[in-house]
């Protein structure tokens, strides 16, 4: 039996090359997420229930990346998370939330809380705009009475086709924050808010769809409701779907890809996880638009320990990237990234983007509450193949769990852990992107594709790795 050498990020360094780059701002981190989707920084937040829901996905898109909403929600809950992202940054909300004027004030309060919005357009029985109700109107109104009693009736509106500059002038002139767009019949066609205009200005590097809304992806499984879930997510506005399975080089994954592509041929579809060239080849033949690479490399993954299977991440990326390049299909490196240097190595090895989980877990935008232990703050971070995640998933799917059966039947390939509380994800993404920009400059590259052409790896010993770390000093 022949043994192949497998290397990961800590086994190698990139050899510095001549660079004509005088400032990191001269580098361009634009890259392909999938066949037809471009993002402005090469980072994707992992589809994990302790990493990505709408708050994380919004932050990722504003920074120029993309978030993948995890699938361990009901179909409607997951679709709502996608909708929240799309509504968070659209210059014009196409289907703004509205409520009938004869509904109670309590109905408006409940609806606004459920949708996490600050105001509602008010319509009559013919769906024509008759008013607007905001938090200010409802603040001291109590719960009795109808919306018609408290709404603002004299609403400033604009016609379809109004330009952004015209909308800004109208909002400023009338000192208002919301501008409904109505046609000649009084039917609502959209809504422009001052907040959305501000967001459009404040995040110039944001990744957006053709309508100017934040990019967002969502994960689906390979069993049960995956087609129904896919349809709901696409209808909600998901830009890309991710077929999410631990062993992506399997008939379950391949048949799911084919079925989704058959039902939704225009859907951008990512699938994984795989770790070999043949796995990439088979998924690409099935119709994927990007391949997610990484088996057992994540910080909370114990697949390699439990099953004995896996490929060191750098070798896996390099092997799969050769196949991806042959077919024009991007590769996503998923797992094992602990530093911006690791991300740079993954990109240099052929990945078009890097999926990150543990680095983003513990941030304000990740789901979950902050815990305090021994005077320090943490958040829970768990693998999606952990027992806790499996039980949570089954509870969502069936509405009940049998702990005895779950413990007997399930073999965990992930663990549940705590990661330090890190504050906002924005700062982490700035550091990651800045590190990769510096990495490009050391490789004499202005772009990620140019770095992949220039890249030269050198294998290092454990002594070389130790030399690469801070040493012979007492860290403060």
Curated annotation (Swiss-Prot):
Keywords: CBS domain, GMP biosynthesis, Metal-binding, NAD, Oxidoreductase, Potassium, Purine biosynthesis, Repeat. IMP binds at residues 299, 334-336, 357-358, 381-385, 413. Coiled coil: none annotated. It catalyses: IMP + NAD(+) + H2O = XMP + NADH + H(+). NAD(+) binds at residues 244, 294-296. Pfam families: CBS (PF00571), IMPDH (PF00478). The active site is at residue 301. GO terms for biological process: GMP biosynthetic process; GTP biosynthetic process. Its cofactor is K(+). Its EC number is 1.1.1.205. It is an enzyme of class 1 (oxidoreductase). It comes from the Archaea. Pathway: Purine metabolism; XMP biosynthesis via de novo pathway; XMP from IMP: step 1/1. Mycophenolic acid (MPA) is a non-competitive inhibitor that prevents formation of the closed enzyme conformation by binding to the same site as the amobile flap. In contrast, mizoribine monophosphate (MZP) is a competitive inhibitor that induces the closed conformation. MPA is a potent inhibitor of mammalian IMPDHs but a poor inhibitor of the bacterial enzymes. MZP is a more potent inhibitor of bacterial IMPDH. Residues 92-150, 151-207 form the CBS domain. K(+) binds at residues 296, 298, 301, 467-468. One of its GO terms (molecular function) is metal ion binding. HAMAP family: IMPDH (MF_01964). Homotetramer. NCBIfam families: IMP_dehydrog. Catalyzes the conversion of inosine 5'-phosphate (IMP) to xanthosine 5'-phosphate (XMP), the first committed and rate-limiting step in the de novo synthesis of guanine nucleotides, and therefore plays an important role in the regulation of cell growth. Belongs to the IMPDH/GMPR family. This is Inosine-5'-monophosphate dehydrogenase. It comes from Nitrosopumilus maritimus (strain SCM1). The lineage of its organism: Archaea, Nitrososphaerota, Nitrososphaeria, Nitrosopumilales, Nitrosopumilaceae.
């Amino acid at each position: 039996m022949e043994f192949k050498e497998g290397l990961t990020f800590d086994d190698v360094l990139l050899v510095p090359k001549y660079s004509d780059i005088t400032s990191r701002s001269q580098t361009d981190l634009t890259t392909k997420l999938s066949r037809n989707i471009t993002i402005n920084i090469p980072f994707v937040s992992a589809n994990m229930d302790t990493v990505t829901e709408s708050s994380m996905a919004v932050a990722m898109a504003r920074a120029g990346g993309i978030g993948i909403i995890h699938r361990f929600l009901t179909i409607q809950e997951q679709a709502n998370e996608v909708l929240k992202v799309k509504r968070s940054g659209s210059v014009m909300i196409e289907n703004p939330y509205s409520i009938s004027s004869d509904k109670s004030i309590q109905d408006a309060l409940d609806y606004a809380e459920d949708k996490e919005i600050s105001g509602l357009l008010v319509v009559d029985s013919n769906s024509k705009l008759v008013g607007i109700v905001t938090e200010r109107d409802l603040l001291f109104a109590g719960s009795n009475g109808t919306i018609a009693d408290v709404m603002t009736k004299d609403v400033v509106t604009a016609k379809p086709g109004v330009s952004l500059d015209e909308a800004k002038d109208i909002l400023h002139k009338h000192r208002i924050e919301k501008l409904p767009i109505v046609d000649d019949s009084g039917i609502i066609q959209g809504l422009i808010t001052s907040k959305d205009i501000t967001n459009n200005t404040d995040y110039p590097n944001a990744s957006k769809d053709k309508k100017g809304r934040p990019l967002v992806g969502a994960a689906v499984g390979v069993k049960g409701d995956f087609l129904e879930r896919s349809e709901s997510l696409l209808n909600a506005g998901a830009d890309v779907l991710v077929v999410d399975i631990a062993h992506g080089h399997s008939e379950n994954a391949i048949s799911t890809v084919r079925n989704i592509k058959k039902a939704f041929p225009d859907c951008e579809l990512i699938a994984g996880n795989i770790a070999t060239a043949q796995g990439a080849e088979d998924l690409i033949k099935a119709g994927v638009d990007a391949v997610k690479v990484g088996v057992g490399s994540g910080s909370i993954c114990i697949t390699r320990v439990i099953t004995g299977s896996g490929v060191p991440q750098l070798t896996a990326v390099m092997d799969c990237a050769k196949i991806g390049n042959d077919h024009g299909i991007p590769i996503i490196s998923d797992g094992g990234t602990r530093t911006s240097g690791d991300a740079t190595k993954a990109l240099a090895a052929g990945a078009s983007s890097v999926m990150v989980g543990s680095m983003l877990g513990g941030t304000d935008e990740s789901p979950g509450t902050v815990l305090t232990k021994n005077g320090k703050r943490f958040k829970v971070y768990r693998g999606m193949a952990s027992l806790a995640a499996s039980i949570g998933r089954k509870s969502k799917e069936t509405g009940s769990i049998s702990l005895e059966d779950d413990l007997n039947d399930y073999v965990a390939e992930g663990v549940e852990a705590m990661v330090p509380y890190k504050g906002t994800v924005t700062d982490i993404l700035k550091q990651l992107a800045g590190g990769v920009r510096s990495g490009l400059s050391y490789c004499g590259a202005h772009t990620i594709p140019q770095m992949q052409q220039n890249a030269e790896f050198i294998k290092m010993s454990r002594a070389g790795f130790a030399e690469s770390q801070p040493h012979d000093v007492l860290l403060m």
